[in-house]
Amino acid sequence: MPITRMRMRPWLEMQINSNQIPGLSWINKEEMIFQIPWKHAALHGWDINKDACLFRSWAIHTGRYKAGEKEPDPKTWKANFRCAMNSLPDIEEVKDQSRNKGSSAVRVYRMLPPLTKNQRKERKSKSSRDTKSKTKRKLCGDSSPDTLSDGLSSSTLPDDHSSYTAQGYLGQDLDMDRDITPALSPCVVSSSLSEWHMQMDIMPDSTTDLYNLQVSPMPSTSEAATDEDEEGKLPEDIMKLFEQSEWQPTHVDGKGYLLNEPGAQLSTVYGDFSCKEEPEIDSPGGDIEIGIQRVFTEMKNMDPVMWMDTLLGNSTRPPSIQAIPCAP
């Protein structure tokens, strides 16, 4: 036969009246208000024999803990005791007097008068309604669109639909649908695309480069004459260069070279080649160009060695120039 154990409320009253558990005492015995020590196990100075004595006694009373058989688990003891206190219909917590923090943390409870049979029945019916509503809400939350679609697909439909289809009004329905539906214009899709070009304005790097196009005018007859005069003056400039340069042939240790000394004679430098002044002609540059071309042609055909000997044979060494001996 199972052993009947004492219910929590009378067992708790007996523990309070015994004064064996430290911190468990009446605050107001007339109003049945009492306090339970509720110190957190993580705080400094927490003792299992002092702060968890009530929870351990309840675990031993319910048979969930036996000394020597299981290791002490004060955390589980306290959780089980709290759940049992919250499940009691005739005990409620006085939250405005409870202290949940610190080393002197306590919870204050009040014992209510015992319930009658009618009150117990009402309480049970209310709890049953609450549980039913909770299960319904849970089922509604679990239902998904997939389950609804499965339920709809599971319903079978008859193969013969003639029993609930009005055959006489089929043509009228079609005519009404045609009248209601607006006439839609046919959609024509053309594969040809109109040619388009992206307009792009090419700007210069700087605005200072913007110049208008200018066309040079044709040269006049006077300007053309000046150009011909300039071409005729070119040979005269060349002759002046020959006259200004005064190179004299000389030699040092049997080696000849040309020397540019002031006062030298053109005949000694150029030898037998000389240019005679021609009378001025109305068309400048005509005969002068022919004479210069003749001189250069004779110089080109003549042997350069003979030309140098001719130049050096007629020259004398000036007394002002001294030979510089080469270092050994």
From Swiss-Prot:
Residues 141-157 have a biased composition (Low complexity). Phosphorylated by CK2 and this positively regulates its activity. SMART domains: IRF. GO terms for cellular component: chromatin; cytoplasm; nucleus. GO terms for molecular function: DNA binding; DNA-binding transcription activator activity, RNA polymerase II-specific; DNA-binding transcription factor activity; DNA-binding transcription factor activity, RNA polymerase II-specific; RNA polymerase II cis-regulatory region sequence-specific DNA binding; RNA polymerase II transcription regulatory region sequence-specific DNA binding; sequence-specific DNA binding; transcription cis-regulatory region binding. Residues 92-164 are annotated as: Disordered. InterPro entries: Interferon_reg_fac_CS, Interferon_reg_fact_DNA-bd_dom, IRF1/IRF2, WH-like_DNA-bd_sf, WH_DNA-bd_sf. Keywords: Acetylation, Activator, Antiviral defense, Cytoplasm, DNA-binding, Immunity, Innate immunity, Isopeptide bond, Nucleus, Phosphoprotein, Repressor, Transcription, Transcription regulation, Ubl conjugation. Pfam families: IRF (PF00605). It is found in: Nucleus; Cytoplasm. There is a cross-link at residues 276, 300 (Glycyl lysine isopeptide (Lys-Gly) (interchain with G-Cter in SUMO)). One of its GO terms (biological process) is regulation of CD8-positive, alpha-beta T cell proliferation. The modification N6-acetyllysine is found at residue 78. Residues 5-113 bind DNA. Its main location: nucleus. Activated by MYD88. It comes from the Eukaryota. Belongs to the IRF family. Transcriptional regulator which displays a remarkable functional diversity in the regulation of cellular responses. Regulates transcription of IFN and IFN-inducible genes, host response to viral and bacterial infections, regulation of many genes expressed during hematopoiesis, inflammation, immune responses and cell proliferation and differentiation, regulation of the cell cycle and induction of growth arrest and programmed cell death following DNA damage. Monomer. Homodimer. Interacts with EP300. Interacts with MYD88. Interacts with PIAS3. Interacts with SPOP. This is Interferon regulatory factor 1. It comes from Rattus norvegicus (Rat).
